[in-house]
Each structure stands twice: as structure tokens, then as C-alpha cells.
């Protein structure tokens, strides 16, 4: 697994946990990585670069949540955000953050990573759902945004 993929997965877990327990996402991210380090999940280790990338993603999503959610709501024509699975919504939030605020990451990389994370953490139809909405959003993002 690449460092950035690991970072995206950690960020997803932190944002998802934040939604469930209404706790600060950075605190959740720290707890997730500490539990791995303490051996609760001995097969997982947290790379410091992955943690830094996850932290950047979490902070970016939280800081820009209104703009990100607005884009998602605008392009998810037949789905209210309240109806979306929390995992799918947070995968979308992470990817939309990358599309809007990380022009150094190619759009196709962001989309592919989101789809792969959706396959791993989401339901059977999550990958196609995420792909459909991200495709709509990506088509409206200019390189200057």
C-alpha cells in the first residue's frame, strides 16, 4: 500500500469516527494511530508520512466542509446527503478536497484512489456511487481552483 493510500484510509477512519461520536477529527486520527502503535492491530503500522498526509486531509476537509458539502450536494441529484452512507460521504469529502484544493494531485489519481478506498471500506455499490458523483464534480473543476 502506498503512503498516500494509507493516509487516505486513516483520514477516512478519522472522519467517519468523527461523524459517529461527534469528536474532533484530529483527536480521532491521533487515537487511531496510537492504537496501532500500541499493538492493538499488530499487522498495521503507521508511517509518519502517511500520518502527515492523513492529518492534512482531515484538516483540509474540516476547514472547507461547507464548500465541499455544497459541491457534493449540487452533483448528487437524486441523493440527499442525509441518505448517503457515512463511509461514502466521507470518501467523497476527501476526494472533493483533493480535487478542489490539491491541484498537485492529478484528478484521475484522486478519483482512482477514492474508488479503491470505496471498494475496501464501502458497500458493494459504493465504488460505482462514488465514481458517478466524483465524475460529475471533477468535470466542473478547473486547474485554477
UniProtKB/Swiss-Prot annotation:
GO molecular function, one term: RNA binding
CDD domains, alphabetized: Terminator_NusB (cd00619)
Gene Ontology cellular component list: cytosol
Entry-linked InterPro entries: NusB-like_sf, NusB_fam, NusB_RsmB_TIM44
Top-level division of the source organism's lineage: Bacteria
Family assignment from sequence similarity: Belongs to the NusB family.
Protein known as: Transcription antitermination protein NusB
Amino acid at each position: 500500500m502506498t503512503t498516500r493510500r494509507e493516509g487516505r484510509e486513516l483520514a477516512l477512519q478519522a472522519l467517519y469516527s468523527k461523524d459517529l461520536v461527534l469528536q474532533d477529527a484530529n483527536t480521532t486520527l491521533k487515537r487511531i494511530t496510537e492504537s496501532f502503535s500500541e499493538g492493538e492491530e499488530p499487522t498495521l503500522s503507521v508511517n509518519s508520512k502517511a500520518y502527515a498526509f492523513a492529518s492534512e486531509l482531515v484538516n483540509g476537509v474540516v476547514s472547507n466542509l461547507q464548500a465541499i458539502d455544497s459541491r457534493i450536494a449540487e452533483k448528487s441529484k437524486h441523493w440527499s446527503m442525509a441518505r448517503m452512507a457515512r463511509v461514502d460521504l466521507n470518501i467523497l469529502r476527501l476526494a472533493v478536497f483533493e480535487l478542489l484544493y490539491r491541484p498537485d494531485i492529478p484528478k484521475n489519481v484522486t478519483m482512482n484512489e477514492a474508488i479503491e478506498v470505496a471498494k475496501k471500506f464501502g458497500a458493494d455499490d459504493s465504488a460505482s456511487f462514488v465514481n458517478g458523483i466524483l465524475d460529475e464534480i471533477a468535470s466542473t473543476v478547473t486547474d485554477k481552483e
